[in-house]
């Protein structure tokens, strides 16, 4: 299996399976002399960690991260990067592979069982193996390192829709996001989602969600035309997340309903004499290059395919059969996708920052003369 690495200069390679001994990643291309602490990485992982509420899988994984290489202890505390590959390891401790014994030969509808088998002629049926969302913990660890490449930049995510219930954007409050199990920025939507997901969970079913990401403080100029577009790389990174089925940047598909007057972001000079956009329909990216405005992206996640309802399928011998999935699963995988989406955005931004610096050096001076 190839394609376990993403990025150009800031490169992340992940390894491991859901029920293997461990999962991990190697971060290559990270600049030297960046300070961070193990607690920085652990805090990011804890936001994604399973089993923290009744609305996520009850698999109990502490997700304790170990740094194996690429750092030295800093005299003032914490660690400092050396510029060599940074290896991060997370041991798996709560696997229950016996839950999957009955489906070893049959394909679960909606999962990657059939496609892995038809491509490789073999698959790891234990919790989905390499295709499991368990792998995303490694991306979160890598994202915590990527964040150190971009001081002054913030990346935040929130769930904005679960099933048919969407937040009221007039009540958006980032301070509310860590105060509920849904990463929800609208406090009045929280009880609605609680009631809704309780019903979904008790029925043994699942539901999809939409996650919104906002990056602020991103320097103008990151990204490159035509095949190195920042939004294209961001979309690719987000679609690489398990269960992701769609991505929007800025207005996204809604832009198809707008007129040119409505969609184009007008510009004036701000208080510091630099261009300022009066709106942000573009989502902070024009021509594949960051404008300096907040970068706004959304990605949609399908319902978890592991449900208790019996489903029709076929097995490896070509026989029709019926299947239902045991094990522990998220009733809404979109909830824990928030820190994963943030991490992928961090990695893409760090990569483009290093690529931009390598090509043009410091940011181009503005205004232009003559």
UniProtKB/Swiss-Prot annotation:
Q: Where does NADP(+) bind?
A: 48, 54
Q: Name one Pfam family in it.
A: Chorismate_synt
Q: Which EC number(s) does UniProt give?
A: 4.2.3.5
InterPro entries, from UniProt?
A: Chorismate_synth, Chorismate_synth_AroC_sf, Chorismate_synthase_CS
Q: What class of enzyme is it?
A: lyase
Name the GO cellular-component terms.
cytosol
Record protein name field: Chorismate synthase
User: Highest lineage ranks of the organism?
Assistant: Bacteria, Pseudomonadati, Pseudomonadota, Alphaproteobacteria, Hyphomicrobiales
Q: Per UniProt, what is the name of the gene that codes for the protein in this document?
A: aroC
